[in-house]
Amino acid sequence: MNADPVLSYNFDAIEYSVRQEIHTTAARFNAALQELRSQIAPLQQLWTREAAAAYHAEQLKWHQAASALNEILIDLGNAVRHGADDVAHADRRAAGAWAR
């Protein structure tokens, strides 16, 4: 008679991996934005007053959007942490039900 397969998870490892991927994604995103800023910086010196003002208005929108995305990534990382805690707790409760 074959034993039933056991389904098990390492909740800490799953949480760590997902949160690490979120952190890596945020770092790549912010590095790309910084690279873009450094490439645009020399051009800004050549722009007329109107062009500079137009760029500044758009750059402010980009900055706000980037900040919002970074906040979303932070919230996502926190949700992953809390979700992993919730799943681990549910698993312990389920295991406890069999111990009765």
Curated annotation (Swiss-Prot):
Pfam families: WXG100. One of its GO terms (cellular component) is extracellular region. Keywords: Secreted, Virulence. It comes from the Bacteria. InterPro entries: ESAT-6-like_sf, T7SS_ESAT-6-like. Its main location: secreted. It is found in: Secreted. Elicits strong humoral responses. Induces significant lymphocyte proliferation and up-regulates the induction of TNF-alpha and IL-6 in tuberculosis patients. Belongs to the WXG100 family. ESAT-6 subfamily. Induces apoptosis of host cells via activation of NF-kappa-B. Forms a tight 1:1 complex with EsxU. Complex formation results in induction of alpha-helical conformation and stability against chemical denaturation. This is ESAT-6-like protein EsxT. It comes from Mycobacterium tuberculosis (strain ATCC 25618 / H37Rv).
